[in-house]
Amino acid sequence: MDNIKTNEDALAAIKQKGRALSYVPKELITQELCLVAVNQNGLALEYVPEGLITPEICMVAVKQDGEALEYVPQELKTPELCMEAVNQDAYALGWVPEGLITPELCMVAVKQYGWALSYVPEELRTPELCMVAVKHDGYALRCVPEGLITPELCLVAVKQSRWALSCVPQELKTPELCTVAVKQNGRALEWVPKALKTPEFCLAAVKRDGGALEWVPKELKTPELCLIGWLEQYRVSLDADESPF
């Protein structure tokens, strides 16, 4: 990028790679050039000189990549700009000033990615919002306030993600819930209370995923169960080898 000597060089470079703006000599950087850069890659906003940052440039940047909101000056972060950013990328919620975070904005974010719940202020984590979040990402259960964790919410979460069972309070890990979890993914056996790990339960988990064998109590690892687990893992590896992708 050391060969950027003229306006033409700069324009050609940033049309290919917006973040190449970082290599453009300061005397060649104009608002027009910055607009081209952020239109190609919103994150190029990081390299726009402070004196050239305008509301228009910021809007173009966040529409291209919501996480460009990180580089928007605080005084230019408007409700409209933040909504555009979050619409483009839910994780942009992490760069929204606390005073601009609304229930509507949070709902837009978690409908895209459940884990965006981690950026929602706790006082805005309502039962409805938490349910939407875990429907999209069961592991978002980790971000649900303790007082809002219900059996229904846990059931939705474990149906969506094997990892969700790790976030379920021990007192809510019922045989029924754990059964649903291992049916979704046998490796969820890792977070099943030992008291519930019966021979039948472990067999069901290993049949679902041979890798679950790792979390079967030693005293229940019979030769028959190990064989089933190994055969299941072998079958999966064969399927993977035959996949065209």
Regions of interest found by a model, annotated:
Residues 1-245:
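Non-catalytic tandem-repeat scaffold regions and their flanking low-complexity/translocation tails
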